Each structure stands twice: as C-alpha cells, then as structure tokens.
Amino acid sequence: KINEIKEVAQSNNLFLIEDSAEALGASVNGKKVGSTADSSIFSFCGNKVLTTGEGGAIVTNDKAIFEKIKLIRSHGRMDNVRYFENTEQSKYLELGYNWRMSSITAALGISQISKLDKIIKMRQDNAEYISKSLSKFPEIITPSSDGDSEHIYQMYTIRLSSKEIRDKLHNF
C-alpha cells in the first residue's frame, strides 16, 4: 500500500513520513521498508530487531530535510559549531530539542548492524517453526506473507477463528 499512499501524497503535494518503527530489514516488492517516503522513522527500543535500549532514527535522502532534522535534534543550533569555544556563533536558529543519541547508545546500535541479517533470519526461522507447530490447530491463524514482502517478525501475532476461542485462551 505504501506505493499507493506515495502516489496520493505526490499528487496532493504532501510530505510523506513512513512509520517503519517495527520494520527494520523488512521489504515490500524487493524494496526495503523506509526507502519510499520523504522520511522514515525507525525505533531502537528494547524489543526491536536492532536495539539500543531506547531512541531511534529518522532517515531521508532529502538534504533540506536532513539539515532541518539536525537543527531540531540539537537545540535548534548548527552542529558544526563549537559553541563553548566561539561565542560569536552561539545563535539558536530555530526551536529545537536535545534529541541526540548518546555515544554509548549509538555504539550499541552500530555494533549490531553487521548482525542484522543473521538476527532477522533467526526470527524468520523461529516464526516458521512456530507456524508449522501451530498448523495442526485450524482455529489458530498464523502470520503469512503475500509473497511480495519479506516479514522480519518484529512480533509474532496469531489470530483465532472465533471470539469464543479467544476468550477461552485468554481465560486459560
């Protein structure tokens, strides 16, 4: 659906932000999630495929958006100025916040990037095993892919064929 959404956004001159918080490494039609919109957002919270314990990232291939994001995340100041050494350039260009990731948190995330494909493969293998094990229960509907997408199984969510079965399982 992201391509349809992008067409609507473009035809109406709208800025498109893709919520990719739980999809790092997933793909649709051979294209990585997070690469279609003007900007995309990924989460690195504790239960994500790649975790830093907290925080996340915004990605874009638009230089103007990139520069704006840098201002917002750094108190509205340019990040190439040494503010404590040069009082002449201590201007706040606009409203901003302290949304910079700490170096130790970033290092934790960077250390996992080389393992990302392996982590995703492990999740996919685990999901396949669980789905196969649950296949003998027709009332349990396991996750599936439409063939054009690669699921990373951020979560493994089942559906049940009826409310009554759901209630019984819930009360078990």
Q: Language model features by range: what are they?
A:
Residues 2-11, 27, 63-172:
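PLP-dependent aminotransferase class I/II
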Residues 18-52, 67, 88-93:
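Conserved active-site segment immediately N-terminal to the catalytic lysine
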Residues 31, 61-62:
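Acidic, low-complexity intrinsically disordered segments
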Residues 14-15:
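Hydrophobic "anchor" residues on beta-strands that sit immediately upstream
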Residues 49-53, 149-152:
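Short glycine-enriched loop/turn motifs at secondary-structure junctions
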Residues 5-9, 30-33, 55-56:
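Short, glycine/charged-enriched secondary-structure capping and boundary segments
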Residues 42-43, 56-61, 110:
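Short beta-strand-to-turn element immediately C-terminal to the catalytic PLP-Schiff-base lysine
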